[in-house]
């Protein structure tokens, strides 16, 4: 579509599975991308089948048959007869169901909490002892914070993360650190800088990475400085590769809009900054950018080899930008073990030889009053952001992804798409 407006893209990348740039250049999936997506979507489905089969005591064959038949649109009574649900009730009746489960009388009260308030809750039953810091890294990896009217958009800002990790390294009360990462990656340079900060922190105290639903590409890169990596079987990780998309607006600017350009320069490449605006990218410029990407990929591969104690040849076999599901990642040694955040905290305590410990969140989560003031005052576009979420639904994340394209650094270590599993 962009070509219709006179906008073209030149792709520089390493890794046949690094498919982000297909957004700019192709009208369908490449065979390599279809291969990796089929693999991890199939793996996610098999994990879901196993979990539901065990929980509901329903055979996997039956579940597959239900899925094929669009059971979601069947009569609700069928859901019960097929053991997919236990019963039916209206919203106002759910409290009585919970009370029965808790052994409470119907006239007794129960406290309720919004799921957002417990989404990142930590088991704090042990509030005494040495501190284990839990540091949250969520969103796209960037060099500097980019102000946005879309307020709730989270970022991993390398300058801030480095400063925070240095402070944790110097904090004598903190005996170990858990990095809770949920990110599809981002700026390759920023990922390298955070990697070093993690590595330097790990020299002073154990660092354990706890991967959420996604810790891929640049997010995996920064994890290589840690001592131990934990993920879930359904985590998307790996994606060891780098790409760049060089936009060329010259047709739009000169032919469709009629702008005229001229230049005076002292050296052959003095006018490098005009590439893609007043003229197309030259062959020399494209080759230079490809070499730049190649060096970035080789460095990424080296960091993985060092962090995972592999040879570069071993890394190359599982790299090429391929995204791996947690179950596969464990088998090919991209991660050390399975577990959630509480398991990662326990592992950090073990590595730090702590028998009594408490988890402390960094950066500290905003208090309820601060959140209330943000909502009331529309701080950082929170109100607009929420309205966009409501209006766009599943299209919200792709919208943010497209909006961010113009702000990205040219060389990226990022997951190639927004994943929406339905």
Enumerate the predicted regions with their spans:
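Short, well-ordered loop/turn and helix-capping segments at boundaries between secondary-structure elements
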Residues: 4, 200, 213, 228-231, ...
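C-terminal long alpha-helix characteristic of the crotonase
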Residues: 54-55, 86-131, 301-307, 336-378
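Active-site proximal loops enriched in glycine and acidic residues that flank catalytic Cys/His/Asp
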Residues: 136-139, 181-183, 211-213, 233-235, ...
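Short glycine/threonine-rich loop-to-helix capping motif typified by GTGT followed
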Residues: 188-193, 328-331, 371-376
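Cleft-lining beta-strand/loop regions that shape enzyme active-site pockets
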Residues: 125-252, 294
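Extracytoplasmic
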Residues: 4-7, 47, 61, 66, ...
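Intrinsic disorder and flexible/low-complexity segments
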Residues: 129-132, 136-171, 364-422
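Charged, glycine-interspersed solvent-exposed loop segments at helix/strand-loop junctions
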Residues: 2-97, 250-332, 336, 342-348, ...
């Amino acid at each position: 579509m962009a070509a219709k407006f006179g906008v073209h893209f030149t792709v520089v990348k390493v890794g046949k599975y690094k498919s982000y740039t297909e957004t700019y250049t192709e009208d369908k999936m490449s065979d390599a991308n279809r291969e990796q997506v089929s693999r991890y979507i199939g793996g996610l489905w098999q994990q879901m089948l196993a979990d539901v089969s065990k929980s509901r005591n329903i055979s996997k064959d039956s579940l597959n048959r239900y899925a094929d038949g669009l059971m979601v649109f069947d009569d609700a009574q069928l859901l019960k007869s097929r053991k997919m649900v236990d019963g039916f009730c209206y919203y106002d009746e759910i409290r009585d169901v919970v009370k029965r489960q808790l052994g409470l009388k119907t006239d007794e009260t129960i406290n309720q909490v919004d799921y957002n308030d417990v989404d990142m809750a930590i088991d704090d039953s042990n509030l005494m002892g040495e501190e284990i810091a839990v540091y949250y890294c969520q969103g796209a990896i960037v060099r500097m914070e980019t102000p946005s009217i879309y307020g709730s958009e989270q970022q991993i800002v390398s300058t801030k993360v480095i400063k925070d990790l240095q402070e944790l390294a110097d904090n004598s009360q903190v005996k170990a650190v858990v990095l809770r990462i949920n990110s599809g990656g981002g700026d390759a340079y920023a990922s390298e800088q955070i990697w070093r900060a993690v590595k330097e922190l790990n020299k002073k105290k154990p660092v354990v990475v706890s991967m959420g639903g996604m810790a891929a590409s640049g997010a995996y890169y920064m994890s290589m400085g840690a001592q131990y990596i934990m993920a879930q079987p359904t985590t998307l990780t790996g994606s060891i590769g780098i790409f760049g998309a060089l936009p060329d607006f010259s047709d739009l600017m000169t032919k469709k809009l009629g702008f005229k350009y001229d230049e005076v320069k002292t050296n052959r490449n003095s006018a490098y900054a005009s590439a893609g605006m007043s003229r197309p990218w030259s062959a020399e410029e494209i080759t230079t950018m490809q070499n730049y990407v190649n060096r970035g990929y080789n460095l990424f591969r080296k960091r993985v080899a060092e962090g995972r104690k592999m040879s570069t040849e071993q890394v190359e076999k599982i790299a090429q930008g391929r995204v791996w599901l947690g179950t596969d990642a464990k088998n090919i040694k991209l991660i050390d073990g399975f577990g959630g955040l509480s398991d990662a905290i326990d592992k950090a305590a073990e590595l730090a030889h702590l028998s009594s410990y408490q988890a402390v969140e960094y950066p500290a989560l905003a208090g309820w009053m601060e959140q209330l003031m943000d909502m009331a005052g529309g701080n950082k576009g929170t109100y607009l952001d929420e309205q966009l979420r409501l209006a766009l639904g599943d299209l919200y994340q792709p919208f943010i992804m497209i909006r961010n394209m113009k702000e990205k650094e040219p060389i990226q270590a990022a997951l190639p798409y927004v994943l929406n599993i339905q």
